[in-house]
Amino acid sequence: MQQYILNQRRLSRETLLLVFLTFSAFGVLAQNSYRNELGGRITKTQFEEQILTGPYFGVPGDQEGEMVLVYRMPVGKVENPEIFYEKTGNQEAFSQNKNLIVVYYPGPDECNSNSGDFDANAMKKAAKSLDKWAEKHNAVAPIYVYKNYGGLLAYEEFMNWQADPDGVFEAEFFSYPYPCKSFVVLHPSGEYRAILGDFPLSQIEVALKKLNRANR
């Protein structure tokens, strides 16, 4: 099973250190090596410090026993943004220069199964805020995408969840099962802003504003 180390405010420093010790125990035979988000080699101490103090996850690398830092707030540009509009049935929105707001749910995990943010009333309130921001900041109605449907039944009345179409969002933005949920806001220019793993809802509006400002 793939494992990841997560950096969240609601987790204590002691909890994170316990996770690190667990990784160390399982990694003795594998001779773990560590890399930063650019692929450069770093020490275990540097790896752990980045997760404890910065916006990073630690995820398994391509090689056995390798752990790699992943920056939680990626900003970039995709080569073919139109495919994401097509896969979600929003071709017209692409031609109208509208943003896509995508909330990605990996499936039930310890984070979203025990978070007050996933209370039905909290989710309903969040959905209303996203609808309002979408209309205000030139975006299509929010798109709710899942990898594993488990745990979503309680939100069906006010959120239209759909399977990740052909896995395009996982492949491009969410290659690991980042905890709780993640989001990406995509502009027709291909520019995007995302947060991997649990996030303050207000950051979606921040992303919309920044993308609109950059693409005037």
Regions found by a protein language model. Give the residues of each.
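Acidic carboxylate-rich catalytic motifs and surrounding loops in phosphoryl-/glycosyl-chemistry enzymes
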Residues: 145-150, 196
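Thioredoxin-like thiol-disulfide oxidoreductase module
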Residues: 149-178
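Short, solvent-exposed loop/turn and secondary-structure capping segments
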Residues: 112-115, 155-156, 196-197
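Thiol-/selenol-based redox modules, centered on thioredoxin-like
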Residues: 188-193, 197-216
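Short, solvent-exposed loop/turn segments at secondary-structure junctions
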Residues: 106-109, 149-151, 191, 200
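Bacterial Sec-dependent N-terminal signal peptides
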Residues: 1-35
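Thiol/disulfide oxidoreductase modules built on the thioredoxin-like
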Residues: 170-199
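Non-globular targeting/processing and membrane-anchoring segments
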Residues: 31-134, 140, 146-148, 216
